[in-house]
Amino acid sequence: MANSESSSSPVNEEENSQRISTLHHQTMPSDLTQDEFTQLSQSIAEFHTYQLGNGRCSSLLAQRIHAPPETVWSVVRRFDRPQIYKHFIKSCNVSEDFEMRVGCTRDVNVISGLPANTSRERLDLLDDDRRVTGFSITGGEHRLRNYKSVTTVHRFEKEEEEERIWTVVLESYVVDVPEGNSEEDTRLFADTVIRLNLQKLASITEAMNRNNNNNNSSQVR
């Protein structure tokens, strides 16, 4: 498995001329401090910038997690098991010869009550060294057309504080606005789902970290 892989599709020149770049690196998410945002701005510009055309919208969300980035990344990188921390996923199926690398796919079944039943998703980016991953929705029964997402995991450390190491997770997306919906409605729905997922990710990985610390303490004794 390669540490860093990515792929992209060519963009039509006429379409490209009508697009504008997102400015997520200039707008601080509400869950970040100014110091965190300053340190993350370069990564946001690099990994969380999209080209927007008519009928498209995008957003960036952040989650602070009181656990080391290695622990958080061990969960986030599992393209084959999104249900570990993602709400509303009933099951995820991959092929028998599945290998986690750019281009692999998963078939996700969504719980009832959402405007979706199934989703086929493709791994677009996986960089274990920089802790970056991304996927796009390529098919299925849902309303999120041309959905593309990137998630990055970032380490923070302050020696003078008791809790020296923590993690910030950034997740962004770009998607078509469904017919009959506004950009605001589309962002509200997608943001809510992602925010719930990130909160669950924090809960799970913080518990993992506590268990690791307890085990280490027991061994020391």
Curated annotation (Swiss-Prot):
Q: Which UniProt keywords apply?
A: Abscisic acid signaling pathway, Acetylation, Cell membrane, Cytoplasm, Membrane, Nucleus, Protein phosphatase inhibitor, Receptor
Q: Which domain of life is it from?
A: Eukaryota
Check the record and name the InterPro entries matching this protein: Plant_def-hormone_signal, Polyketide_cyclase/dehydratase, START-like_dom_sf
According to the record, mutating residue 88 to A results in:
Reduced affinity for ABI1
Where is this protein found? Cytoplasm; Nucleus; Cell membrane
Instruction: Give the location of motif Latch loop in residue numbers.
Output: 142-144
Stretches with biased composition (Low complexity): 1-11
Q: Name one GO molecular function term.
A: identical protein binding
A single cellular component GO annotation? plastid
Result of changing residue 87 to A:
Normal affinity for ABI1
Q: What is known of its domains?
A: Upon interaction with ABA, the 'latch' and 'gate' loops change in conformation leading to a tight dimerization and the creation a surface that enables the receptor to dock into and inhibit the PP2C active site.
* Task performed by this protein: Receptor for abscisic acid (ABA) required for ABA-mediated responses such as stomatal closure and germination inhibition. Inhibits the activity of group-A protein phosphatases type 2C (PP2Cs) when activated by ABA. Can be activated by both (-)-ABA and (+)-ABA.
Q: What is this protein's name?
A: Abscisic acid receptor PYL1
